[in-house]
Amino acid sequence: MVKHQPLQVYERQLCLSCLTGIYGCRWKRYQRSHDDSSKWECSWFFILCCSFLLLLVWSYFWLEAHNDYNEFNWLLYNRSAIWKDGTVPILAATLTGFTYTAFLMILALCHIVLGQQLNLYWIHKIVVLAILLTTITGVVFIDDFWQDEWDIVIISLQFTGPFLHIGALAVVTALGWVIAGQVVRVERSSDLLLVLYLVPLFISSPCIMDRSKLGPRPAVIGRRGAPMLAPEHTIMSFSKALQQKVTALEADVTISLDGVPFLMRDRTLRRTTNVDKLFPARQDHDASFFNWTEIRSLSAGLWFLRDDPYWTVQYMSEKDRNRTANQTVCSLAELLRLAARTNRSVIFSLRQPPHQHPHHQLWVSDALKAIQRSSILPEQVMWTPDWYRKKVRAAVPLLQQTSDEKLPVAELKERGISTLTLHYSQARAQDIRQFSGSNVSINVYPVNEPWLYSLMWCSGVQSVSSDAPHILKKVPNPVWIMSADEYGLIWITSDLISVAIVIGIFIFQKCDTQWKMSGMRSYNPEQIMLSAVVHRPSRDVNLMKEKLIFSEINNGVGSTDELSGYTGNGLDTYSRDDIMTPARHATKL
């Protein structure tokens, strides 16, 4: 009696099952297909790619915007009157969405490599579409609410551009294996690689320079003291900044109802004091409508322990926490005395009181009186307000005149301005060189990250204002600096390695395809085993089955036209006529 073995003998493919199961919920082998993906599924793959790329840019934006997280939270506070760290939910949602789409992208690329049909599961489609729409909404919101922050992307590319180019080159080179299997897209992929190879021609960075031309390390100015280590605008904050070896102290000055200049950034006292406890009916009033006695009675440190704006309270000692709780609002006179005692400079901006304020017209003279009554030298004070500048120069001629307005050099000289205080988005390398050549110093704010500090250093700025002097203190040299020749060598080397790998991939793919085709042409379909007398491994059975299918397609032979037994080990073979059914056997008899 002849035993027959079924044609469909499968080997376990756990990895492939997981791949198609997670991506398209196709866990069974009969659900998979090697056919070309439909236009509908290709459209969803395009949507997935768009979601991934948009999230990649969105993630990069928030990664570089870390320098200005506190500014973002402060803008949210001004709009909602409630202090909260709005970056936490944004970062959590961005990380989740990016991880999800990146995982699906990897699965989709694996489908393409293995020749599997793309068939994204409907739940994945809903989630991907929701991620895309949410990201677009976030981009529109930031463009409306924080539009100026987009500049950080352009500026950061001057620092990260060379490394992003190498990373993109490595990714595209690694995807060469996928691209090589798609013959139709070879020409397009070659164009993409050519563009990537030539990208360094358009990369410009201040850090690509000769080390001999690097200027001195920029001085660090404590912006509102050291607000990451202690409550802003308090004596404790300025003392912490002095411990970090800052060269100057920066503050925002407001005039009280009785004409005392004090330090306050906000229009009201709600955020940085306990005014809601002592004066609940007046908590939304302008800070300048409180007299100095009332202001002095407020705590300027409890809010820092409660809100923990920089996530640093957990690292404070018990002594520092007690000291923080006892901080009060600081006056300009106190700041000037501290600076005089430690031989530091002071730079401040002055806010004019409202029209109903009794010192609305006297605000400049009130600030000048505080300077003249203190023991600080006039040349240690950097005067920023443009109001009544001529009168100020006439009253105290030794004050250092500074401006936060980017003006032509001739006009700066006419006004007697020797220092420009600019936002980092306005500090271009060519402008910095021009001002420095005219003996106008450049101070850039806010600079809280080492990469931005390094970029400003290579650009040639003289000083930076920072909320994080304790971080910049740990940057003795630029994070990276290289000459044009060194960068050119890295560029050419990486391009040559990429070209060699891509050519090797295409050659291997071509040879592998030719080998498979030659193997199918030389294989005899009659070698397929029907008899189970000799049990062959399932892997061999599958291989022979696949070769039979391909050979039948090429030779036009149907599976019902010819079947043979297995000839191995001296066993006889049987044709279709030799295998008789019971009916045929009875007829013959």
Q: Where would I find each of the regions flagged by the language model?
A:
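Phosphate-group recognition and catalysis centered on beta-loop-alpha active-site segments
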Residues: 1-589
